[in-house]
Amino acid sequence: MMIAANIISLTVLFAVPLLLVALGGMFSEHSGVINIALEGMMIIGALFACFTLQAFDKSGFGPAHPQLAMLAAILVAGLTGTIFSFFLGFAAINLKADQTIGGTALNQFAPAFAVVMTWAIQGQGLTTIAIPSWVRITRDTFGLAPVDGPSFWNNLIFKYFYLTTPVAVVLFIAAYIVMYKTRFGLRLRACGEHPQAADSVGITVYTMRYAGVLISGFLGGIGGLAYTVAAGSGFNSDVGGYGFLALAVMIFGNWKPFPILASSVFFALFKVIAAYSSSLSFLPKFEGVKEISNFYQMLPYIVTMIVLIFTSKNSQAPKAEGIPYDKGSR
């Protein structure tokens, strides 16, 4: 039962960054801009958020007000991710550069920048920014008495509970409402489907595309912090390819919030199963095969490729995504 509780709670924990980053990609691509740079946005958001947590830890504010400090770090992650996404927007919208190449360049820049910044602040050779233990939400956070011995519900709720999870729930609901229940969402989707028609009725396509890219940066930055917290080993100037996995989640989810949510849980579950492969009796052990655990660690990425092979043909991407908008081409 304890393993089941851990698997469920870890699945939620690892689904959160996938959900946030995939939703960010959804906003950008519905506006008409392909966002390959989600990985870089995650790295930049996580970098500055972890520096913020480290500063709060040293000042004593973090241990005294852990969730306020965590909320501030989440906002820093979102803000820095937004700033970083501006470079993609400028290249793709103003300069009309190839969006895939621009995103790839930002992805290459982000980890190198993170290493340099980490060395500059912590000292050369120190590439890991530790995550303080007080960021986790515990029973004590709610004034509840500690539990003696193992408890299914305690493991399920509190073992891997961070503020990023309720924040992700709020942002998911907000993303759905904004995308499908507001005039802004309608205009954003119009710019990704028929930008010339949108322009003809007075919608500023450039502004809406910038909005989509900046929103993706905000969500991507928070997703970077969520991944770093979930990984538990501190920030190491990368996010384990989660930005690219989030792209797969977005495509598998057909650029829609609820399918993206289901896809996030699906892929996160396979990642957790890989982590617990040695403890799960129903998984084949392949006696005599060396390092079988490495196979299970590859499983989430193998599943990703298989799923995309069978679902990509039915995916309906925004019609004008990746096509620079030229007002004079109407």
PLM features: what roles do these ranges have?
Residues 1-22, 34, 48, 57-72:
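Membrane-interfacial amphipathic/re-entrant helices at transmembrane-helix boundaries
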Residues 15-24, 40-44, 83-86, 192, ...:
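Hydrophobic alpha-helical segments embedded in the membrane of multi-pass proteins
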Residues 27-48, 93-106, 187, 232-245, ...:
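Short, non-helical or kinked segments that cap or interrupt transmembrane helices
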Residues 61-111, 271:
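Alpha-helical transmembrane segments within multi-pass membrane transporters and channels
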Residues 110-180, 282-295, 315, 322-330:
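Transmembrane helix-bundle core of multi-pass membrane transporters
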Residues 156-234, 257, 262:
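Helix-loop-helix "hairpin" substructures at the membrane interface of multi-pass membrane proteins
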Residues 193-207, 277-330:
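Cytosolic-side transmembrane-helix boundaries in multi-pass membrane proteins
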Residues 230-301:
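Transmembrane alpha-helical segments in multi-pass inner-membrane proteins
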